[in-house]
Amino acid sequence: MTRNTSEEQLILVDERNRAAGSAGKTAIHRAGLLHRAFSIFVVDARGRIVVQQRSPDKYHSGGLWANSCCGHPRRGERTIAAARRRLGEELGVTSALSFGFFARYQAALGNGMHENEFVYVYFGRLKSAPRPDPAEIADIAHLSFDDIGRRIARDPHAFTFWFKHYFRNHGAEIARLAEQVSRLAAM
């Protein structure tokens, strides 16, 4: 089970992604401070993206569907190392991750929480069956890029803000990179 991470010290950044200090995770999300984050899209051998339904007990966006894994590097931690760590903690898998693109977004999430993130988006190949931590993940699904788009269009309130943001603003990149990872899986 994942430990309580509410007071982890996360990396504050400026608009150019330069480290500008640190603060506790809860305080950052209450105040909407700009901070460093990552998101991961894990792709299976059939080219489908592993998506997760967040645990209803999460401090924000509980019960909503999101990409494979997301999180924050801790103060002093490299972003790629944090991404690998969280992939194991949340999904119970390891994967060689490749950088895909940067994303930047800001949103009020309700419940007094705000996202204001500079995000490193990584892609990886699923090599073993996920073993999700139930404290983090309520359910998982393997969906094609087109299936995800249809589901978001049909029921947008079932998805996290950031997942919809990625598909709206980086959809072509996600489709291209997921296809590349899928081709590597077939080799």
Please annotate each region the language model reported.
Residues 10, 48-49, 140-141:
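A residue-level structural signature of the nucleotidyltransferase/glycosyltransferase Rossmann-like core
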